[in-house]
Regions:
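Short beta-strand/loop segments at the ligand-binding rim of alpha/beta enzyme cores
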Residues: 31-36, 78-90
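Conserved small/polar residues in nucleotide/adenosyl-binding loops
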Residues: 115-117
Length: 117
């Protein structure tokens, strides 16, 4: 689905749909070239990390990593629980690409999503 912004308000955008598509629930939104100022982790993410710790997973792949802090937010939770889980940073936007060197300093590995970049 592709949208064209036709008006911008303080807390929402008015968009025109450019093609035929159906938007389902629980879908992410990719806005190329725009920095999205949202927290790296949701409450659901935190619960999923705790589940991963309890179930001795080896890796966590964190989507839409933008910077080093996004990885460190997960690492802090893992450290609080003395977990050896490794973090794979999924780079899916330009901000992540721009900060890839600092992300590599703290992540075990990276995955690049060529569809989103």
């Amino acid at each position: 689905m592709e949208l064209k912004v036709i008006d911008k308000k303080d807390d929402f955008l008015v968009c025109e749909v450019e093609n035929d598509a159906t938007l389902g629930s629980r879908k992410s939104v990719n806005v190329p070239g725009v920095r999205i100022n949202l927290p790296s982790l949701t409450e659901k993410d935190r619960k999923n990390i705790l589940w991963a710790i309890e179930n001795d997973l080896d890796f966590i792949a964190h989507s839409f990593v933008r910077n080093k802090q996004d990885v460190m937010d997960i690492q802090r939770i893992l450290d609080e629980h003395n977990s050896p889980i490794k973090i794979i940073a999924k780079i899916e936007n330009q901000e992540g690409v721009d900060n890839i060197d600092e992300i590599l300093e703290v992540a075990y590995g990276i995955m690049l999503s060529l569809i989103h970049i």
